[in-house]
Structures are given as C-alpha cells and as structure tokens.
Curated annotation (Swiss-Prot):
One of its GO terms (biological process) is L-histidine biosynthetic process. The keyword Magnesium does not apply. Catalyzes the condensation of ATP and 5-phosphoribose 1-diphosphate to form N'-(5'-phosphoribosyl)-ATP (PR-ATP). Has a crucial role in the pathway because the rate of histidine biosynthesis seems to be controlled primarily by regulation of HisG enzymatic activity. It is found in: Cytoplasm. Pathway: Amino-acid biosynthesis; L-histidine biosynthesis; L-histidine from 5-phospho-alpha-D-ribose 1-diphosphate: step 1/9. It is an enzyme of class 2 (transferase). The keyword Methyltransferase does not apply. It catalyses: 1-(5-phospho-beta-D-ribosyl)-ATP + diphosphate = 5-phospho-alpha-D-ribose 1-diphosphate + ATP. This is ATP phosphoribosyltransferase. The gene is hisG.
Length: 230
C-alpha cells in the first residue's frame, strides 16, 4: 500500500487535493469529515493520511509515508540531510513564504549578512554577551549563519510564540522567521537583510527515498502524474 500524506486542514488541504485531482488522483473521504484517513478513487493501492504540515515533513523523513505535501521550509528544518532523505518531486505553486533574517530597522548600517557578521564579532565586547537570535528554525539558522556565512558568535533563543515580537520584548536582538508579505515584520519595525533569505519556500510534493521505491512502477507513476499536473 502506498501512503500519501496531505495537510489535515485549511487552504493547504484544499489546494493539495486540487493538485492530486488534476493529476487524476481524486481524493475521497473515508468515514466522517473528522477522519484522518482518505482514499484515491479507483485506486486500491493508495491510501491518504491527513497530518499537520510539520508531521508530514517528519514522517516523510522517517519513511513511514511514501509521499507528502508540505512546505520546503519544514522539510529542510526537520531533516538533518533533506536531499539525501527525500526527493522534492514538484513545487506546487501555493503556500509561498520565505524564511528570512530580519534585524531592527534602527540598525541603519546593517543591510547584509556581512554587516551582521561585523556586528556579531563586536557584540560581545560591547554588550558582554553574544548576539541573540530568536527563531523556530534552529537548524536552518545554524546552517545559514555558521556554514554559509562563517558567523559563529551568536546564540539561538528558541521562539515559542510570535517570533517577530522578540526584539521589542528584549528577548532577542534579531530574528529568523517565515514571512509571506513582510507586513508583520514591518509592523514590528524589522527589515529583511538584502541577502537574508534562507529558503524561498512553497508547498512541495515530496517522496521518501526508500530502497523499495527503486523500480516501483506505481511510485514512478504517481510522481510523474504530479509533475505533469503542475
């Protein structure tokens, strides 16, 4: 049995189902509207599991589902080596949002990651502590700051609430957060660095890289149908 995981609610659920229907894989409910299982009309070899977007990313990485629709940001944050663990079969054209580095607007001389690196280097001497970054994306933040930009002098503050409010509340100096329009960042007097986009995310159709998928005609057919539909 092939399992496709879809978002369990909201616009993402509707849009994901629409993509599958265009691909000739019409989703039908099993039981009542609150059921977390579905099926594909005319296909006894496929089942649908309804999960949250973050759960889908995790289950794809673990290989407990075969395909899933979820945000690229969640996959790359949730998995240690995303490209080795999953295949991004298709970008679906909805759920657009960027994971970005944002700093206070009053930091007039900080417009790039290089500028921020200079600030981080001087921060401890000036303030007696490391630059604090509030985020829910600790893996992406570490990769972007340390590996891509060579910035080491910072500490991550786990954000449990509205990340964009952390600098004003004194909980952090800057943030790494996801944004669709940037309006919430502007409302909190934050600006995105010119080269501070970590991931340009959108909903993706993702396949778990499982040995048993190699040469499986049904797996290849599903992936091909989705690619053709978008």
């Amino acid at each position: 049995m092939i399992t496709i995981a879809l978002p369990s609610k909201g616009r993402m659920k509707e849009d994901a189902s629409a993509v599958l229907e265009r691909a000739g894989l019409k989703v039908a409910s099993v039981g009542n509207d609150r059921s977390y299982r579905g099926r594909i009309e005319g296909r006894d070899d496929i089942e649908v599991a309804y999960l949250s977007a973050s759960e889908i990313a995790r289950e794809i990485g673990a290989g407990t589902v075969d395909f899933g629709v979820t945000g690229e940001d969640l996959v790359r944050e949730g998995l240690t080596n995303a490209d080795a663990q999953v295949e991004f079969c298709a970008r679906l054209g909805f759920g657009h949002a960027d994971v970005v580095v944002a700093v206070p607007e009053i930091w007039l001389d900080v417009d790039s990651m290089a500028d921020l690196g200079d600030v981080a280097s001087e921060f401890r001497a000036r303030h007696g502590r490391r630059l604090a970054i509030a985020t829910k994306y600790w893996r992406l933040t570490q990769q972007f700051f340390s590996r891509q930009h060579g910035i080491q002098l910072y500490r991550i503050v786990e954000s449990l609430g509205a990340t964009e409010g952390a600098p004003a509340a004194g909980q952090a100096d800057i943030i790494v957060d996801i944004t669709s329009t940037g309006s919430t960042l502007k409302a909190n007097h934050l600006k995105i660095l010119s080269d501070g986009i970590i991931v340009r995310s959108e909903a993706c159709f993702v396949r778990a890289r499982k040995p048993e998928h190699e040469g499986d005609a049904a797996i290849q057919e599903i992936a091909s149908r989705i690619k053709a539909a978008v």
